[in-house]
């Protein structure tokens, strides 16, 4: 054994230059969610501007404004992060993940704010707290407690972090990335449908 020691073979699926890059997917997702939360605290989502306006006009106006803010926030954040030195392996995937998760956060929080007013915003804040621990952004889920492991698959931020990681460093299977996109799209469409249902109540 000592005369001919075993040689290990190492294979790298991705490369992360430092701890900041490793934590970036978590911080990017957190910033987009908080941005949507702040917007829905400041924007009068329940206010009707025109008494003679239709429910459809109200819905489209709220969705359009929220969508524009979400899009602008995502593009600005992604651009500034790259401009300040964040190394991105797949720029298209990076922007797409930022935009999609920004829409998901915006419309989910918008629905909660519209449906329940301030209690709904509080629920959105609780959702943020749960995602901080349960999305797997700081520590591997294998060393996280059972509660967070149980809710992990149901949190939108789980999938944005996963796709951001692949955009930054690669190494994640395409099928897993596609699943992340499908889940975020499902959250976005579901939130819009729930928001649309409110105008008929």
Predicted regions and their residues:
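Membrane-spanning alpha-helical segments of multipass transporters and channels
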Residues: 1-199
């Amino acid at each position: 054994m000592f005369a001919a020691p075993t040689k290990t073979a190492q294979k790298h699926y991705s490369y992360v230059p430092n701890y900041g890059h490793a934590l970036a997917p978590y911080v990017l997702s957190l910033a987009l969610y908080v941005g949507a939360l702040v917007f829905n605290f400041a924007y009068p989502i329940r206010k009707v501007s025109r008494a003679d306006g239709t429910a459809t006009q109200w819905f489209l106006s709220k969705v359009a404004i929220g969508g524009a803010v979400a899009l602008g926030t995502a593009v600005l954040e992604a651009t500034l992060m790259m401009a300040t030195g964040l190394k991105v392996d797949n720029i298209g995937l990076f922007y797409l993940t930022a935009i999609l998760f920004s829409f998901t956060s915006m419309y989910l929080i918008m629905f909660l704010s519209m449906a329940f007013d301030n209690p709904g915003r509080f629920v959105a804040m609780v959702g943020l707290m749960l995602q901080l621990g349960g999305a797997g952004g700081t520590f591997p889920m294998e060393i996280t407690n059972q509660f967070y492991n149980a809710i992990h698959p149901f949190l939108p931020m789980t999938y944005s972090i996963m796709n951001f990681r692949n955009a930054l460093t690669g190494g994640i299977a395409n099928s897993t990335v596609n699943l992340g996109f499908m889940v975020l799209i499902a959250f976005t469409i579901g939130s819009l449908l729930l928001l649309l249902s409110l105008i008929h109540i």
